[in-house]
């Protein structure tokens, strides 16, 4: 009987550990995806509106 209890506790413990590892990996991939999205948004903003010195206009005024 004690052998069954020990093996049951071992199985439950290993299941808990593996599920926590899976959750960590899932969180890491979600964070990486969010970082990639933020980088893409910042690159799009740079393409749309490049930084210019104050008072500079792309048009010539005579």
From Swiss-Prot:
One of its GO terms (biological process) is defense response. InterPro entries: Frog_antimicrobial_propeptide. The keyword Nuclease does not apply. Residues 22-62 are annotated as: Disordered. Keywords: Amphibian defense peptide, Bradykinin receptor impairing toxin, G-protein coupled receptor impairing toxin, Secreted, Signal, Sulfation, Toxin. Residues 43-52 have a biased composition (Basic and acidic residues). GO terms for cellular component: extracellular region. It is found in: Secreted. GO terms for molecular function: toxin activity. Expressed by the skin glands. The modification Sulfotyrosine is found at residue 62. Pfam families: FSAP_sig_propep (PF03032). Residues 20-48 form a propeptide. This is Phyllokinin-1. It comes from Pithecopus azureus (Orange-legged monkey tree frog). The gene is pp-H1.
